[in-house]
Curated annotation (Swiss-Prot):
It comes from Xenopus laevis. This is Tripartite motif-containing protein 72. Residues 272-476 form the B30.2/SPRY domain. Disulfide bond formation at Cys-244 occurs in case of membrane damage that cause the entry of the oxidized milieu of the extracellular space, resulting in homooligomerization. The lineage of its organism: Eukaryota, Metazoa, Chordata, Craniata, Vertebrata. The gene is trim72. It catalyses: S-ubiquitinyl-[E2 ubiquitin-conjugating enzyme]-L-cysteine + [acceptor protein]-L-lysine = [E2 ubiquitin-conjugating enzyme]-L-cysteine + N(6)-ubiquitinyl-[acceptor protein]-L-lysine.
Length: 477
């Protein structure tokens, strides 16, 4: 390597990549990159790594305030400063011209004979004036780039916060749900324990009574054994008298004390069926409290009649006198409840009994209520329904509703909504201790949601049965 190349390499190695000046108080973090101590101290600290400073080159964490100044490198910088500045390190001529193609300050020899030969060359003073005029524009470009990166960093910071918040809420929900399960299982364990204790007490009491009787007979038998030993050497008359008495008593004891039978203790069998029953009961117990909802008559289509208490709705054969409300359904025989939701978990039940045609679920605040309804999730409808009293359907994005396999004929439908889990599930809740899942929609819900009910046309009385919101009396809660 020639001396000029060596000098150029030294200048590059002794230059701070932050201030583009020769090192001042150089420090070297563990990653091996070197900067001025003041420059590295001015770099913003990490917010998530105990306040460490990232290396501007490789992002490795460092603490510039704890780093020692590299004295050997500092002395080398001082020695390099003795080299004449403002001169070409290759030809040692003044840096008097500027190469516009390579954007580099060079000497006359570089321009006429060196690697810049044939390039567009201007004097250093011309370049200074020209670039001075361009400086404001360059500053604007730099500022725009900085602002763009700041926005990107802000977006990433928000995304990091959202991820942390999502995970935190997930952990909290897991803890809440598992604590609820543990609580229910503890209650179940205590209940089964009491049942077992009661069975044990009854069985033990019966056994102790029988044991007391057997103990009394045992005492008599031992006494008779002693009598028989005594009569063995007695005279004929006395022997016969006592022997007959003992024999009679023995026969009586044997007749009065049959051998003990097997005592059965009535305890639950811990089988797979038992575990399944416990799971079903626990699942029902962990559901949110039943919502006490009422139908909103101001949203009911004009053929619908809502009961005075707001718990029942049916389709009449004549139009009702209703006000013109923007939220009222005008064509379909539908309505929503007065209650609506924007967060949390919710559960409600609707009595359908033997009504042959109906639909229910949830709709978004922005779902269209005028004209023909296009009941799909993309249009803000998450519903299931029944037609002909036997065909159950989920209104998905497919061209035709998805037919559901349903055992029997549900008399009551439960609807479970969870904003955090992004689900709305439908259950056959005819048996409150045995909810049967019918269908689940998965959706990332946003905005306000309304419980939705489609009573359907009365069909000349064939479908005149009402839909009823189920809510038990206070004494049954």
């Amino acid at each position: 390597m020639s001396t000029p190349q060596l000098m150029q390499g030294m200048q590059k190695d002794l230059t701070c990549q932050l201030c583009l000046e020769l090192f001042r108080a150089p420090v070297t973090p563990e990653c091996g990159h070197t900067f001025c101590q003041g420059c590295l101290t001015g770099v913003p600290k990490n917010q998530d790594q105990n306040g460490s400073t990232p290396c501007p080159t490789c992002q490795s964490p460092s603490r510039p305030e704890t780093l020692q100044i590299n004295r050997q490198l500092e002395h080398l910088v001082q020695s390099f400063k003795q080299v004449p500045q403002g001169h070409c390190l290759e030809h040692m001529d003044p840096l008097s011209v500027y190469c516009e193609q390579d954007k580099e300050l060079i000497c006359g020899v570089c321009a006429s004979l060196g690697k810049h030969k044939g390039h567009n060359i201007i004097t250093a003073s011309e370049a200074f004036a020209k670039l001075k005029r361009q400086l404001p524009q360059q500053q604007v470009i730099l500022q725009e780039a900085r602002l763009k990166k700041e926005k990107t960093v802000a977006v990433l910071d928000r995304q990091v916060a959202e991820v942390q918040d999502t995970v935190s809420r997930f952990k909290g929900n897991v803890k809440h749900q598992l604590n609820a399960m543990r609580s229910y299982l503890n209650i179940m364990e205590a209940s089964l324990g009491k049942e077992a204790d009661k069975a044990e007490s009854a069985a033990t009491e019966a056994l102790l009574v029988e044991r007391k009787t057997m103990g009394h007979y045992l005492d008599q038998l031992r006494q008779m054994e002693g009598v028989l030993k005594d009569v063995e050497g007695q005279e004929q008359t006395e022997f016969l008298r006592k022997y007959c008495v003992v024999a009679a008593r023995l026969n009586k004891i044997l007749s009065e004390s049959p051998p003990p039978g097997r005592l059965d203790i009535q305890l639950p069998i811990i089988s797979d069926e038992f575990k399944f029953q416990v799971w079903r009961k626990m699942f029902r117990a962990l559901m949110p409290a039943l919502e006490n909802m009422t139908f909103d008559p101001d949203t009911a289509q004009q053929y619908l009649v809502v009961s005075s208490e707001g718990k029942s709705v049916e389709c009449a054969d004549q139009k009702q006198s209703v006000s013109d409300e923007p939220n009222r359904f005008d064509k379909s025989n539908c309505l929503v409840s007065k209650q609506s939701f924007t967060e949390g978990e919710h559960y409600w039940e609707v009595i359908v009994e033997d009504k042959p045609r109906w639909a229910l679920g949830i709709i978004s605040e922005t779902a269209n209520r005028k004209g023909k309804l296009h009941a799909t999730p993309s249009n803000g409808f998450w519903i299931i329904g029944c037609k002909e009293g036997k065909v159950y359907e989920a209104h998905t994005e497919q061209k035709e509703p998805r037919v559901l396999r349903v055992e029997g004929r549900p008399e009551k439908i439960g609807v479970y909504l969870s904003f955090s889990d992004g689900v709305v599930s439908f259950f056959d809740s005819s048996d409150e201790d045995n909810l049967k899942l019918l269908y689940t929609f998965n959706e990332r819900f946003s905005g306000r949601l309304h419980p939705f009910f489609d009573v359907c046309w009365h069909d000349k009385g064939k479908n005149s049965q009402p839909l009823k919101i189920f809510y038990p009396p206070a004494e049954q809660l």
